[in-house]
Amino acid sequence: PYIFLIATFGSSPGYCCGYLADLIESKGFGVSAKFSILMVDTWTPVFNLSNEDKINKKTLTSDKQIGDVISKIERKEPGDFVKRKLPKFVCDIFRKITTSYRKTSHLNVDDKCVGCGLCRKSCPVKAIDLQMKKPVWVKNECVMCLRCLHLCPKFAIQYDNKTQNHGQYLNPHISSLD
């Protein structure tokens, strides 16, 4: 079968296609193609998403890359098309260093919270509960996708004191989180 992998990334896809290819190959299958698509980096503790023009340009670039990837997949084109990948040993080290970034103690909610529960509903790892109509992180770690921060209608969820001025991002092509 034609098995393909796609890594979306903001600054680097790291070695994620390599990790996944190793897993698939350990199950007796081969990976036909690997792709990467540069997208808006939503890690707002570092990246600023407040410049709409810059975000729109990057989204247009992403849309073109998605079209190119779709064409290659439709033709079942084999190959490694991953750009900006990092060596496995670098990613292994980086993963150990960044473990502390996944601590939910970095996340906090301010008084703008209206208790809508969207953060809890949208958390992919069920790390958030609502207590007295406010989010409380019930796991010590999460995947730190920051979906809670980006979806909050009042921008009441922050990562330490690093995200207040960096904005929120919702992909314009996604209308449902189901």
Feature map (PLM): residue ranges:
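FMN-binding flavodoxin-like domain, especially the glycine-rich phosphate-binding loop
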Residues: 1-97, 167
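Short amphipathic alpha-helical segments at helix-loop
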Residues: 50-54, 101, 105, 134
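A mid-sequence, solvent-exposed acidic-amphipathic segment
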Residues: 85-117, 121-124
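Iron-sulfur cluster-binding cysteine motifs and their immediate structural context
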Residues: 108-109, 114, 118-137, 147-164
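Active-site-proximal loop/hinge segments that shape catalytic or ion-binding/gating pockets
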Residues: 169-177
